[in-house]
Amino acid sequence: MERPLLIIQFITGLVLIFGLTSAQERWILSAEEMESIKINGQEVRRLNENVRFVKTDKVILADNAAQYIKDDVLHLNGNTIMINGLDTLTCDSMVYWSKLDSGYAMGNVRYIQPEKDRKLTTDVFHYWQTDGYRGSSFFANGYTRIIETNRLMAANEIKYDDKFQLMILSENASVEDPTRGIFGDEMTIQYADSLLEMIYVNNNAFAYNDLNLKIEKNGSYQKFRDEMTSKEMIAHFQEDYISQLKLMKMATTLYHVVDDSLLAGENTVSGDTIRISFQEGEIKRLQVQGGALGEFNPEGENTRIDTTVFYGGEYIDYHIDEQLSFLSEGAFMEYEGTKLSSGEILVNWETNILDAMLVNEEYPTVQTKGESPMKGESMVFDLVAKHGRIVKGKTSLNQGFYHGKEVFRDDPNIFHVQDSKYTSCDLDNPHFYLGSRKMKMLPGDRVIAKPL
């Protein structure tokens, strides 16, 4: 085995040392003071003041250092700086394994990679060389922040596995862009080369999306924030934009309904699972599964709806651009004291027209507070005008039952019935009845029929 060759030259008190460990690898060292000692039988070179190690495009600076000759391991202390090409790592102290190109940095760690527009700060930073996409894996402990272009990632602990391009953020994890963010106790990030592909949050998930909207057409833009919470969350990305967000277990979301940059209202919805589809950062579709409940609060005169709308169902599907909502399985909608329920409900928010369909014995039903419900096989209802049409309608009044081929409802709570029947028999096909071609019902007052 070739023994290390040491060349020592004293120049105005500065010690220059050239240590050749092999034909391929060498350090060029300099310091104010140097001494060689043995620790546990290993030759160790100690350097003090203005320590400098140089190898090809790597430069390491420190106040003092110890070099373990056989394994080529550097122990660096005080104002430690490693420069590798354009990348710079600074810290209080560091252990560097030269043969492995691996480092363990401690105290006020700051790692800057200008070409990748990336900066990391932490308390403890351990990295090692890999043959993966980024060229190294790492472990960072202490309050850790990573800035990549305009994205900030932070956690008390961050691990990155370059082989699988997988990053794990533990304790107070967060990922934020200028207009959106995701938070949670623990977070897993999947990369596809340089691009963010997926984020999974497995506890106490929270996300937000900032919007600039107007309250008045000629007014100035104001900042609003959509918010989403759940136990677990999965976010998928396409071309650096979030494309889909899935909220699981006790999911809730608050989002703002927008009409051409004008705030139309605020929607709050909850359920077991919520799926939100985005396009370039804007919500395009929202699906709620499992005990879905919602509340829409209109903004001033920006919509024809002038008070809170409550709604729900086992499943809700809201298409934002089309302004359509589909509710199913125990679907209901309540507005200004009138409640409509059905197996399926389709709402057009642009026209405020509701279509309700009979599904699995869940009949379309409309009921005004204090009055008997009216039900039928299908229903069309105008939420604003409170006018509606019910096919094969049925209701009870004054201990009797009224049937009609079609029932038209006017506000306030007036029903016009075509081909009507009145009976005291509660069957859908009564044994006896009084019939009329037209009937007008005023609940709590009287019924007008002509001709009998």
Residue positions per predicted region:
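Bacterial Sec-dependent N-terminal signal peptides
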Residues: 1-27
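Structural signature for solvent-exposed beta-strand/loop edge elements and short helix-capping sites
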Residues: 24-452
